[in-house]
Amino acid sequence: DGRIALMGDAAHAMLPYHAQGAVQGIEDAWVLARTLQLHGDDDPAAALRRYEALRKHRAQRLQQHSRNAERWYHLDDADEVAHRDARFRRHAEDNPDGFTKQQVWLYAYDAEQAALGTDDDWRALPDW
């Protein structure tokens, strides 16, 4: 009936490969609080639906990419390991002091802008 919100691991447990478990809980709390502040007096259930819509996609993408990272970090095949390591080296050579597009998407999320509905860039996660 729209009166309960889950957040953090209760809503979307994370594997440790992007160190996002606690971070996602903090993002959830911020977006939920701000969404309720902005819309909760008029229609709390609608505010909770908005919170879910704002957070669900990002959390699901992070879960998927964390599963992908698990595979990358635990390869058994020597050829696959060599291919992975070559990709890491190329990135380091091409961009020694910067972040990948994926890292920017991961670490530059602005919960305030998301809650206000003014930042849709977080939806477009580049392929890893």
Where are these regions (language model features)?
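C-terminal lid/capping helical subdomain adjacent to the catalytic/cofactor pocket in oxidative enzymes
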Residues: H12-A13, V31-G40, A53, H74-W128
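Conserved mid-domain beta->alpha element of the FAD-binding
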Residues: D1-N68, W72-Y73
